[in-house]
């Protein structure tokens, strides 16, 4: 009975993995399709990869999306980590409940509501301060707003489970609290920070709804360009670009996982040596 249950769970796991990754493999396969029809196989060809470099609209949108994703992920990681430290290390302070609610709100708020409220905010700020102009800046600010919540929740969970006695021991030996945090606590929560950055990068790169509200003329992200092309039919060079992005993201994730695993093994070894 137990073996049958394990086999059933394994089958469900394989089915879920197939649903996730077979469409990606099909997309990569059709990026080498010689036919201009995206769903009709016409032979193997790399034509669409060569034509991709001449599609200025797609390349500019992809570059803008990467700039937005990197900028917003970095900003969200900084703000989210600081918020997580405040919530974990300072159990009681005025406005803690309000801060917790503000951090959690973007997680449950529909994207269309977030987009509308951000648009109204930027319009009001433009009328009062003549800043910011709708475009790259407004997209980054909006993405930082909803990505910070994911960083805070992730880092807060890791920080709450960290052994604070190590940091206290460092301070007892004369280390400044800031130095103790940077050299003791920060390496412990580094995997959570890196994971949060990758999550925010993916969310920002994939966002369509919020970006559509807060973007301006000449600031179309890649999801916006692809969505506009869907109405007329997706060209095969979109498959080529998507394949390149999938491969690049895969390399980044594997590299980050290897680096985090290496750092974790080194930290465990140093801890064992210190205990001996």
Where are these regions (language model features)?
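Cytoplasmic-entry segments and transmembrane alpha-helices of multi-pass inner-membrane transporters
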Residues: 5-13, 82-118, 167, 274-275
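C-terminal transmembrane helix and the adjacent membrane-cytosol boundary/short C-terminal tail
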Residues: 2-11, 19, 86, 95, ...
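Hydrophobic alpha-helical transmembrane segments of multipass integral membrane proteins
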Residues: 63, 67-79, 83, 182, ...
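Transmembrane alpha-helices
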Residues: 12-24, 151-156, 162-163, 177-206
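Transmembrane-helix boundary motif in ABC transporter permease subunits
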Residues: 1-6, 70-103, 124, 254-261
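Interhelical loop and adjacent transmembrane-helix boundary motif
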Residues: 2-5, 36, 49-60, 205-258, ...
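Membrane-interfacial helix termini and adjacent extracytoplasmic/periplasmic loops
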Residues: 37-42, 46, 95, 112-146, ...
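N-terminal, non-cleaved signal-anchor transmembrane helix
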Residues: 1-56, 60-63, 67, 255-276
């Amino acid at each position: 009975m137990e073996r049958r249950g394990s086999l059933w769970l394994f089958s469900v796991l394989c089915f879920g993995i197939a649903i996730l990754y077979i469409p990606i493999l099909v997309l990569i396969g059709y990026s080498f399709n010689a036919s201009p029809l995206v769903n009709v196989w016409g032979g193997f060809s790399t034509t669409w990869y060569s034509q991709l470099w001449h599609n200025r609209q797609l390349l500019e949108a992809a570059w803008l999306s990467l700039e937005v994703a990197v900028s917003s992920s970095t900003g969200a990681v900084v703000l989210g980590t600081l918020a997580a430290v405040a919530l974990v290390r300072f159990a009681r302070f005025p406005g803690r409940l309000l801060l917790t609610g503000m951090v959690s709100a973007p997680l449950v708020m529909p994207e269309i509501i977030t987009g509308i409220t951000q648009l109204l905010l930027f319009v009001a700020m433009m009328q009062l301060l003549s800043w910011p102009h709708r475009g790259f800046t407004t997209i980054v600010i909006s993405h930082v707003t909803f990505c910070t919540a994911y960083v805070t929740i992730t880092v807060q969970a890791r920080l709450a489970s960290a052994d604070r006695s190590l940091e206290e021991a460092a301070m007892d030996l004369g280390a400044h609290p800031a130095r103790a945090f940077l050299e003791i606590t920060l390496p412990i929560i580094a995997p959570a920070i890196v994971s949060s950055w990758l999550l925010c990068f993916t969310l920002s790169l994939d966002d369509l709804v919020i970006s559509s509200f807060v973007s301006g003329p000449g600031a179309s992200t890649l999801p916006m360009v692809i969505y506009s092309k869907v109405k007329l039919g997706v060209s095969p060079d979109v498959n080529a670009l998507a394949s390149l992005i999938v491969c690049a993201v895969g390399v980044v994730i594997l590299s980050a996982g290897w680096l985090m695993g290496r750092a974790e093994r080194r930290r465990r070894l140093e801890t064992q040596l210190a205990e001996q």
